[in-house]
Amino acid sequence: DNLNNRVELRDYQIDAFQNFITYYNSEGLHKNKQIHTLLHMATGSGKTLIMAGLILYLYKSGYRNFLFFVNMTNIVEKTKENFMNRLSSKYLFAETIEIDGDIVDIREVDNFQNTNENDINICFSTTQKLHFDLSVPQENSLTIEDFEDKKIVLISDESHHVNTLTKKGKDDIAEEQSWEYSVNRVFTANRDNIMLEFTATCDLKDP
């Protein structure tokens, strides 16, 4: 109901939502582990729409803080347009978002330290910037404490890039210096953190 009214869900998008909701609500499926999903969707199939729908669903489930990160800055900017710019033809949310009788605003934040618990708070970053912010803490940037103190939904687009360093087997790169280490560190900082990974190019033989 809170997606843009010009958006018409395709059958496979409805299936994706239903599959996630089933997984989210079934402890037997995620076996008492943190929720971590990978959605394999082709380019142009509406990945960002699924992200928007899951943000709304998880807000209703008690989540307020969302980190979107990707390998390339231009994708960050395109996603901001989809999520934040109400004047854009590609804006994905309804003009007014109402959840459980309350009007909900979407806000872009730099960190999660002083977020409004009534809003959808989204921090946009690149994988490189996330790694740098955690390695070299600075004022107003993300810190590991953000992920320890509040439950965060991590949304990773083209997540296979996160694993690049590890999969190439570059032994000379210390694990502590890799992007993958930083992502796993923030994901596991709080047991309630959720990881939603999206990719168009998953190697199903070696996922």
Task: Tell me what each language-model feature is.
Residues 15-20, 50-54, 75-86, 123, ...:
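Alpha-helical scaffold elements adjacent to nucleotide-binding pockets in ATP/GTP-utilizing enzyme cores
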Residues 6-33:
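N-terminal pre-P-loop "Q-motif" helix
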Residues 90-135:
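Inter-Walker segment of RecA-like/P-loop motor cores
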Residues 26-39, 136, 141-143:
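Short helix/loop segment immediately N-terminal to the Walker
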Residues 56, 81, 127-207:
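Signature of the SF2 helicase/ATPase Hel1-core->accessory helical subdomain module
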